[in-house]
Amino acid sequence: MASKNTNIVSKTLVESYIRKQVKALKQSPAETIDTLTKQLLDKPKGSLEKYLLHITPEKLQDTQSGYYKLFHDILPKVNTDHLVTLGMNIGYNGIFTASKNSQTNSPESKSDALWAFMLSIDGINYEKKSAQYKAQISNAKKNGTRCFMLFIEKNAWKLLPLIKKEKDCAFFLFCPSSCLTEKFLDAVKLTKNLFISVAYNSNGNKEQILSTNIFNRLRSRKLPYGIHYYYSVSDLDNFKSGEIFKKLSKEKPLFSFFLSKKADSGKDTVTEEEKKAVYEIIIKERYWLKYPSIPFEIEKDYYYLLH
């Protein structure tokens, strides 16, 4: 009982600290990052810590830096409760718990202590498969996972009851704009542990028409959101020139996610060498951040954050 009470107190203190830092980031980004950087320098460097050290106070004071624009113009307009809840669930409930599990559990279970879990959802036949999805999420949680990346093409609203129930988890929902109805977005506004990523294009051959109005609707509700883009080898020149980062950043997403396109057969249309080339460009852009949206290559970053 004492241990449980200690955990509750510890979690409350961490949440209070995160809330304080989020508010400070909104009000004084450079000073807050300077303080956090000094704290990180005194700690062991995991993948996340090493990345955070790239966001230096100098970059936040440089008006030409994407980090300056992101922290001064975009982040302050996002609801604080969303940022705190997502930060708590990813950081304290997720990464900390997974790390603790990997240290205390048997060697066989260490490989299962994932900080994030990816799952493709069949929105059309969701009712028939919901028990399967819930079991997968439950099993991942037993191993310490508290961050879930859900990919769905239809009927994203069906996932809301599950997401709301798992209050200690963070959910990144990757879906097309067609899922984002006014009613759904109103419900998302009340779902603090949910982060929406809007598909900029489709994974298949058929190109979708994306209305920029959807981003206005997300911003009007002060929701945190990202954009995901399915890339092919024909996009390589746009990666090299930076045009693709510039294009996506115009919609003011916190994050830009990139996924390689798949053929109808499910086979990847991008070779491993081409992915590596794209990833190297993304790492460079993320370090310097010319445009105000932090880019990630889903497959590569997911792998390197786990290893």
What are the residue ranges of the model-derived segments?
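A short linear-motif detector with a strong N-terminal bias
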Residues: 95-100, 151-153, 272
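N-terminal [4Fe-4S]-dependent radical SAM core
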Residues: 45-120, 142
